[in-house]
Structures are given as structure tokens and as C-alpha cells.
């Protein structure tokens, strides 16, 4: 289902855990491709048209089977691409190995890499002197702007996958340091309506269940944040029988949560009630000392935002008299009172630390946006102003049409009479 593997006795440059894992990785990459028909069609076109011929590309993404299919599509389009991980715990080592061995794509990523290694890989990506950066959280672009100003002249543009990354890019633009175009993949309709909501909702609970093997039915789950990721997480938790509480700082989203049937209250009020806490805010220290102090014994905390700062783990470590690993990706922090707080996935993305991330079907649309966003940058080289640009509406609509077609679903089209009515102001009551 994916491009034919490259036969190579001398693998390309890499820093992966174990190349012998490549056969398993290849099987899983091909399996994911079955659920990614839109990206397959784009890859087939790229292979013929080579839109990225002569383009150096650095991708900072979660190294999963779905990302592998994006990387393969970009390479098919002629890109000279390198791939690094966007999170120290999200790499699937068999996938990284397969991309190196079977597809000839340089990969620098290992599950469990420390922060120093992670940043070394970021700099390796920039050593590639990319013309296009695919970013997931804005670490590569931020490093470029802070430390590699001399390379900015090489840049055609960047694409950004996440809410967190878009927040950082907006701050960079306000500060006058974003001097090239950035494509906002996150806010494409075919991305956040599906990836953020259905992908995050399913994969977050998958990660929690894999890490703990708990029954969600009857538990009180506190979801911090009611953006698209929070909506999906709350929806799926309720669907599995949990009693869901939502915490918010935005009054509009709080009203949404109430009218969607959830209890809404401040985190300090929710803290004594919750059995499981899930942060999906993109902000810092959403759960902190005052909340740990009133939580139940055995309360579990997990993060499905981008960075590991939503839960104040540094403070929790200072409060704990002992920390012990009780299961894979599950640590027990024992407080002087004897009460325990259970931290899942080291406070990093639980859906990628303990599970496999979003299902391929939703990532099909997200990565179609990434692929076409990169093509849009190349086609419009030198014509886009510095700053943040949306995915063109026509691209968004085309991705949706291709997805429906692949699902065997047909929809109506406007009649000529309806088109005329929608473009007229003369018809009224």
C-alpha cells in the first residue's frame, strides 16, 4: 500500500534505537497506509509531479506509522527530507528503523531520549539547512530564530501541526521575529474537527487504559480544557461510563461544556472529586500544589496537551517522600501523609507515551494538510508575506471530498437555482 521499500546495504544517516526492528516497522507502516487513502492519492500524484525536487525539508513530528506515510509521500515528491521526533516519549522505534532501512529516510529519534538528545536532534534537523520545516510544537522554528538567524534566508516557509505551536508562532509574530510564512495546519477544518476531537479523545483514553488497565465506568474524570481536544476527551470518557467534570478559563467554552451536559467548576473544587485528571489546555501548571493537596489517595493525573508542563511535576517531586514505578508509564508519588498521586506517562503526551497516538484514519486528513501545505509554500515561494497563513479553503474542501469519496459517501451539490439565490441580495421575505 506504500511506495516500494528502498534496498540499501548502507543505511542513510540516522540515530535510531535498533535497525533490526525494521521488518516490524514496515508491516505497521503498510497497515496504517490502508487507513490513509487521501494521503495515498497525494503521494501518487507527488511521485509523478515531483513538486519538491531540489527542496530540503526537515520534519519534527511524532515518529509513528502515520508520520511515516507522510515522510514517504514527501520523499516520493522529490523532497530531500530528514525526520526528528517532536516529543521524547512518542517515537515508535520500529517505525524509525524501517524509515531508515526500508525507505532511505534519515531519522533521528529514539523513544525515551533525554532532553539533551532531543535538542541535539533539533540541531541536526537544522544542520540539514532546510527550505521547509514541518513543525509540531514549534521547537525547530524557535531554535532557528533564536540560534540560527544566518539560516533564515534558506527558508521558504514552515507548517505547524499543533495548537501549542500556533500559540508560539503568534507570539513570535507579535515580537517581530517570525520573518517567513507559516502555514497553520492546526486550524484547518479537516484537521481540528477530526484529529483534535476524535483522534485525541480516543487515543488519550487508549493511553490511560494501556498504562493502568483501569475500568473507566463509574470513575470521575476531570478534563481540564474544553477546546477541540478537551471536547473529544470528555465525550469519549462519558461514552465509557465515566462521570465527567470540565474545568475552563474561557466563559464561552464553559457554557458549551454545561450545555453539552458536563459539570463545570474550578480545578480547586474538582480536585477532591476526581479519580482521573486529564489536562488538554496547552498551558502551564494547570494542576499544581494546591490541587495535589486536596486530591484523593490514588488520584491519577495525565496530560494530553503538548508539553510536560501542564502538571507541575517539579513541585510534586519536592512534595513526595518517595517515587516508584508501579507499571510501565505509571509512577506513584507518595506524599508524607501517606497519600499517593499516580502520574501517567511522565506527564508527557499520554496518548503517545503509553499508546500509539491518533488512529491513522484521522491522521490521513491532518497529514494531507501537511503535504499540501508544503506544496502550497513551494508553489507560492516569495509571494507569501511573513506571518501565519491558513490552509487555503479550496485545499481543505478537496481533502474532505477525497475522504468522503474514500469512505464511499456521496453528498448533495447546489442546484443552479440555489447558487443564484446564495449569490443574490434581492430576494427577501
Curated annotation (Swiss-Prot):
- State its Enzyme Commission number(s): 3.13.2.1
Top EC class of this enzyme: hydrolase
The reply on keyword Cell membrane is no
Q: Which family does it belong to?
A: Belongs to the adenosylhomocysteinase family.
Q: What is the recorded name of this protein?
A: Adenosylhomocysteinase
Catalytically driven reaction(s) = S-adenosyl-L-homocysteine + H2O = L-homocysteine + adenosine
Q: In which pathway does it act?
A: Amino-acid biosynthesis; L-homocysteine biosynthesis; L-homocysteine from S-adenosyl-L-homocysteine: step 1/1
The compartments listed are: Cytoplasm
The GO molecular function terms of this record are: adenosylhomocysteinase activity
